[in-house]
Amino acid sequence: MKYKIAEGQEIDFKDMDNSFFLIGLLNEFMNRYQVLADRFFCEISWKQCFLLICINLFKEAPTLKEVSEIMGTSHQNVKQMLIRLEKLDYVRLETDPSDKRKQRITLTEKTKKFNEENDAPSQEIMNQLFSCVDKEELEITINTILKLDAQLKLMR
C-alpha cells in the first residue's frame, strides 16, 4: 500500500500489517486534524474544545471521572485542561452537594457564546473534510472504529 506524504513523495507500506498501518494512519490523521483545529480556535486548543463538547453531552453537570471516561483519557489530563478552561471562564468546578469528594463540571455563558459563534464555521469545515466520503463509507468507518474501541475497553 502506497501512502502519499507530500507532493511527489510516497512511502510504500506493502510489507506492513494493515492493522499497524491503520493505527499509524489514525494517529497521523488526528495530528493533522489537531493542527487545523488549533489554528481555527483562537483562545483554546482542539483538545480543550473536545473536552467542552464532551461535557455538553451530559444532561447534568458531569464529574471528572465521567468526562475522563467519555474522552478516553486520564483524570490527570482532564483535570489539567479543566484548570486552564476554568481560568479562561469556560467551565466552573463545583463540589457535588450530595458527595463532597466529587467535583461537578458546569459550562459557563462564555462556553455557550463560544458554541454559538463556532457552530456554523465548524460545520463548514466538517462538510469540506467529509465531502470526499459517501454516507456508506462513513457508516462503515464509524462501525469499525466502534468495534475497535469496544475491544480496547475489554483489554484494560
Label the predicted regions.
Residues 4, 83-142:
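Charged, amphipathic alpha-helical coiled-coil/dimerization segments
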Residues 18, 44-48, 110, 137:
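N-terminal positioning helix adjacent to the helix-turn-helix/winged-helix DNA-binding module
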Residues 26-29, 33-37, 114, 118-133, ...:
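Alpha-helical linker/hinge and terminal dimerization helices associated
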Residues 1-14, 136-156:
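C-terminal regulatory/oligomerization modules of transcriptional regulators
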Residues 26, 52-55, 145:
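Hydrophobic structural patches
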